[in-house]
From Swiss-Prot:
This is Tripartite motif-containing protein 16-like protein. Residues 139-337 form the B30.2/SPRY domain. The keyword Cytoplasm applies. GO terms for cellular component: cytoplasm. The keyword Cytoplasm applies. It holds the Pfam family SPRY. It comes from the Eukaryota. InterPro entries: B30.2/SPRY (IPR001870), B30.2/SPRY_sf (IPR043136), Butyrophylin_SPRY (IPR003879), ConA-like_dom_sf (IPR013320), PRY (IPR006574), SCF_subunit_WD-repeat (IPR051075), SPRY_dom (IPR003877). The lineage of its organism: Eukaryota, Metazoa, Chordata, Craniata, Vertebrata. Belongs to the TRIM/RBCC family. Coiled coil: none annotated. It comes from Homo sapiens (Human).
Length: 348
C-alpha cells in the first residue's frame, strides 16, 4: 500500500512539474509576443523616418532643407534594441533540478519508511524565464527625475486607443483619443482575440518599452481607471485578474468621485488627493517607476508613485466601469502655449 502511495505521489509530482513548465512556457511566450509587437511598431516608425529622410534629400532649397532637418532632428529617438530571450539557457537549470531530485529520491527509497513523509513535502524551485534587452550605452546612466511640467513635457509620447481591444460598449471618437462607456448600447466591432469581452477596458495602440514616457488624460465620471498592463492580460476572462486592478502585472489609479485609489494585485490604497480632472502619467521604464500627477495649468501635484518591475513592453490601459464614464487623451502637441515652469508638489 505504501508503494502504491509512493507511485501516486511520483505521478502527481510529474503532473505538477509538467503544469509548472507549461505555465512558464506561456509566460515566456507572452513576454516574447509583447516584445515582438513593440519591435514591429518600432520597425514601422523607422521606415517612416527613412521615407522622411528620402524626401528631405530631394529638397534643393537650402533654407527649406534646414527647416525640415531641424524638425526631423527634434523627433523622438527610435533606436532599435536587440533582444535576448534566455529560455534555452534556463532549461539546463530545470534539467539539473530534475536530475538532483531523482538521485535524492533513490536515496530516500533505501530507507523509505523513515523518509517517506519528508519526500511528500512539496518543494518549490525558483525557475524563471528571463527576457533581457541589450540597451545602448547612452541609456545606462540614469538622468535626474523631472521636477517641472516643462521637464515632463520633454518625454511626451503620443498615444491613442487601440480599436481592436475596445470592449463593445466603449465608443471611440476624436481619432481614437476619446473613449466613452455607452452601456447598454453596443458598437459593431468585429470579434477579435484582442478585444475585451467582459471588462469595459481598452489599451493603447502604442507599446512603452526601455525609455521614459509622459502623457496626459482627462477623466470624466466616478469609476474611471487609468494605468499600465502587459500584453498578456486575458481579454476574454471574467475573473478579477482580467481587469487592470486585479493582477500583479497591472498598475492603475481609480477616481471614485471623492478621492483617488491606487490598485495593484487586487489590493487598493486610498489616497488623499484630488479632485483633478487632468492626470499626467509618467513612466520611467529602466527605473521601474509609474507616477500619476494631478495637472493644473500652473502646477503639478504628485498623486501616487508605483515602484514597478517591468520585464516586457507595457501598454497604457483604461477601465471605464460605469455608464457614461469617459476618458480623453490630451494632444499635448496642439496645446496653445507651454505653461511656465513650476515645481511638482505632493498631495497632502
Amino acid at each position: 500500500m505504501q508503494f502504491g502511495e509512493l507511485l501516486a505521489a511520483v505521478r502527481k509530482a510529474q503532473a505538477n512539474v509538467m503544469l509548472f513548465l507549461e505555465e512558464k512556457e506561456q509566460a515566456a511566450l507572452s513576454q516574447a509576443n509583447g516584445i515582438k509587437a513593440h519591435l514591429e511598431y518600432r520597425s514601422a516608425e523607422m521606415e517612416k523616418s527613412k521615407q522622411e529622410l528620402e524626401t528631405m534629400a530631394a529638397i534643393s532649397n537650402t533654407v527649406q532643407f534646414l527647416e525640415e532637418y531641424c524638425k526631423f532632428k527634434n523627433t523622438e529617438d527610435i533606436t532599435f534594441p536587440s533582444v535576448y530571450i534566455g529560455l534555452k539557457d534556463k532549461l539546463s537549470g530545470i534539467r539539473k533540478v530534475i536530475t538532483e531530485s531523482t538521485v535524492h529520491l533513490i536515496q530516500l527509497l533505501e530507507n523509505y519508511k523513515k523518509k517517506l513523509q519528508e519526500f511528500s513535502k512539496e518543494e518549490e524551485y525558483d525557475i524563471r524565464t528571463q527576457v533581457s534587452a541589450i540597451v545602448q550605452r547612452k541609456y545606462w546612466t540614469s538622468k535626474p527625475e523631472p521636477s517641472t511640467r516643462e521637464q515632463f513635457l520633454q518625454y511626451v509620447h503620443d498615444i491613442t486607443f487601440d480599436p481592436d481591444t475596445a470592449h463593445k460598449y466603449l465608443r471611440l471618437q476624436e481619432e481614437n483619443r476619446k473613449v466613452t462607456n455607452t452601456t447598454p448600447w453596443e458598437h459593431p466591432y468585429p470579434d477579435l482575440p484582442s478585444r475585451f469581452l467582459h471588462w469595459r477596458q481598452v489599451l493603447s495602440q502604442q507599446s512603452l518599452y526601455l525609455h521614459r514616457y509622459y502623457f496626459e488624460v482627462e477623466i470624466f465620471g466616478a469609476g474611471t481607471y487609468v494605468g499600465l498592463t502587459c500584453k498578456g492580460i486575458d481579454q476574454k476572462g471574467e475573473e478579477r485578474s482580467s481587469c487592470i486592478s486585479g493582477n500583479n502585472f497591472s498598475w492603475s489609479l481609480q477616481w471614485n468621485g471623492k478621492e483617488f485609489t491606487a490598485w495593484y494585485s487586487d489590493m487598493e490604497t486610498p489616497l488623499k488627493a484630488g479632485p483633478f480632472w487632468r492626470l499626467g502619467v509618467y513612466i520611467d521604464f529602466p527605473g521601474g517607476i509609474l507616477s500619476f500627477y494631478g495637472v493644473e495649468y500652473d502646477s503639478m501635484t504628485l498623486v501616487h508613485k508605483f515602484a514597478c518591475k517591468f520585464s516586457e513592453p507595457v501598454y497604457a490601459a483604461f477601465w471605464l466601469s460605469k455608464k457614461e464614464n469617459a476618458i480623453r487623451i490630451v494632444d499635448l502637441g496642439e496645446e496653445p502655449e507651454k505653461p511656465a515652469p513650476s515645481l511638482v508638489g505632493t498631495a497632502p
